[in-house]
Amino acid sequence: MSDRIRVRYAPSPTGYLHIGNARTALFNYLYAKHYNGDFVIRIEDTDKKRNLEDGETSQFDNLKWLGLDWDESVDKDNGYGPYRQSERQHIYQPLIDQLLAEDKAYKCYMTEEELEAEREAQIARGEMPRYGGQHAHLTEEQRQQFEAEGRQPSIRFRVPQNQTYSFDDMVKGNISFDSNGIGDWVIVKKDGIPTYNFAVAIDDHYMQISDVIRGDDHISNTPKQIMIYEAFGWEPPRFGHMSLIVNEERKKLSKRDGQILQFIEQYRDLGYLPEALFNFIALLGWSPEGEEEIFSKEEFIKIFDEKRLSKSPAFFDKQKLAWVNNQYMKQKDTETVFQLALPHLIKANLIPEVPSEEDLSWGRKLIALYQKEMSYAGEIVPLSEMFFKEMPALGEEEQQVINGKQVPELMTHLFSKLEALEPFESAEIKKTIKEVQKETGIKGKQLFMPIRVAVTGQMHGPELPNTIEVLGKEKVLNRLKQYK
């Protein structure tokens, strides 16, 4: 194992980048960068049936969008390639042959039906299902007989008996497994493709991976991988298994859970900021010292400490994600947020597909109005409904405000002044409201609340003069005149 910190993120190109996998990649990235090490991306693409045509491209594209720059991968060979498992068979095969020659592995000719029957019988007896070793000591004659029947063998690793496999997990502490609870396991499938636990151990060794940091659903894989290291006399890497991510019901985040968007692509499409998502994901199962929760990527790299990875499940808090993204939204210049929001405004037919300069100017004013409130760029559409839809029926509280005895006088004065106002801009609108206040003697909530309710149908919202400007003179006058 190398003295240099070398970690890997090893996705399968079977789907889009999931939040859980993004967290695995992010923690590996922070760990590597904190120690001036290497962040490697390896593609585990041996499951051809499940691989998606654009699965690999999607992984790289979304990692890059998040700001996770890799040091080595299919596009950056640093002498440890190939970086796709499907291209490493020439590395695996001599090692498979070596294990067979040393009797550390053997061919198993049992059919899927026979294995399933064994499994069902074990479950019926209340036993933990595991392979019983029926083909562990076949004679040459028996092997020839099975092959004459056309049976394709898998290759199983011969698990040493009465042995304890222990490792010091950087998150969980010491973890031990009794080898007697692990049946001889398949290292090469009947189609000749190495299994995950065999290939990953080989790849980690030859790529000189120093630390394997992954989700704790991989804990049970670790003893099998250690067996491979020991079989070849290699030193295993250090292991760290991160806690699960759970939903509001404290259940493991499932891809079937419709309450939470779980793919990076979905957050991109909604108009979340990559640095905000990076920040949020970095706090899923890891915590800094102190109370601060907003950090740049560079700050995270500097303060990252693997000892602060949590043993407890990480709660995916949608409200917190919205808050974090809002913090970043407020820091951005309006033009950046507008460019993020523009596709959403066009998709909702609120701005033409080929907008004029006037349309764009209006859109920028709309964003400036709501930027401090927006949780994500796409939220501009529901936030700004009052600009495009008919006024909703007023609620009871709004009705009380608009029925105030001062309202007819207020609306008459305001309507008259706004009708004559040019230019119809927020600074002039603000002056006009002050003039109405002086002329009528109506002030405070008695002044502002009825105006807001009359033009927006809401009790609260952004700056009133700015809102009136963005609504436009025609719409504002139409809404005011019914209350004169």
Swiss-Prot record:
Location of the motif 'KMSKS' region: 252-256
GO cellular component, one term: cytosol
Localisation per UniProt entry: Cytoplasm
Motif ('HIGH' region) on chain: 11-21
Annotated ATP binding sites: 255
Domain of life: Bacteria
One MF term in the entry's GO annotations: ATP binding
One GO-annotated biological process of the protein: glutamyl-tRNA aminoacylation
Catalyzed reaction equations: tRNA(Glu) + L-glutamate + ATP = L-glutamyl-tRNA(Glu) + AMP + diphosphate
Keyword hit for Cytoplasm: yes
Pfam families attached to this UniProt entry: Anticodon_2, tRNA-synt_1c
Main location: cytoplasm
EC number(s) recorded for this UniProt protein: 6.1.1.17
Keywords, in A-Z order: Aminoacyl-tRNA synthetase, ATP-binding, Cytoplasm, Ligase, Nucleotide-binding, Protein biosynthesis
Oligomer and partners: Monomer.
Family classification: Belongs to the class-I aminoacyl-tRNA synthetase family. Glutamate--tRNA ligase type 1 subfamily.
Chain's role: Catalyzes the attachment of glutamate to tRNA(Glu) in a two-step reaction: glutamate is first activated by ATP to form Glu-AMP and then transferred to the acceptor end of tRNA(Glu).
HAMAP family named in the record: Glu_tRNA_synth_type1 (MF_00022)
NCBIfam families to which the protein is assigned, alphabetical: gltX_bact
Classification via PANTHER family: GLUTAMATE--TRNA LIGASE, GLUTAMATE--TRNA LIGASE, MITOCHONDRIAL-RELATED
The protein's name in its UniProt record: Glutamate--tRNA ligase
Organism: Staphylococcus aureus (strain COL)
